[in-house]
Amino acid sequence: TSFGLRYLLANLGDLRAVTELVEFTINDQLNDVLAEIVRRRPEIVGIGVYIWNVDAVTRLVSDLRRVLPDTWLVLGGPEVSYETEQQAVVQQADYVITGEADHAFRELCQRLLAGDPPAGRVIAAGIPDLSSIVLPYAEYSGEDIANRVIYVEASRGCPFTCEFCLSALDIPVRMFPVSEFLAAMQQLIDRGVRQFKFVDRTFNLNLKVSRRI
């Protein structure tokens, strides 16, 4: 389940209606993935890059650049948020958004569609106010709820500075508005969800809030 892409989808504003979330796994054949994207003839393709898919994405972006030369290719995700210019996949993309792209992806899409592309390839997303973010949980489909892991998060960031962990760079710690988060969780429960997987770096940092949840 691509949790991050659902955040982007939920926060696209007016562009949400003309955007499609298409998910694949590392077990899918690259040619099949390419064909699924190409047949949609998108104006913009956004791809989440992680340690486990960076090799496949590098090949995919190269193929997309060849087959869809007029399509904007935008990358994001942890694998391209900290080391950018050194990676081959970055060189082949039009843009890379580093950090929390909830609003930055929408803003970039708006500029690209308006014919006003930014000059720089790497776009550093600011730290968004979590109260301004549309929660992504309505983007979970009935099929997702029946067959996929349901990821949730009540906070972002980590107060610790462990040298071995990239989460040390995700500061400061911020909480989503608790009442809004709990209401979204109740909606998921009403839809049949009985198991939640929290992705918070430090869920129990605020014991009062974690106990309430």
Where does each model-flagged region fall?
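Radical SAM [4Fe-4S] cluster-binding motif and immediate context
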Residues: 131-213
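Glycine-rich beta-alpha loop elements in corrinoid/cobalamin-binding modules
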Residues: 8-11, 15-131
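Glycine- and acidic-residue-enriched helix-capping/strand-helix junction motifs
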Residues: 1-5
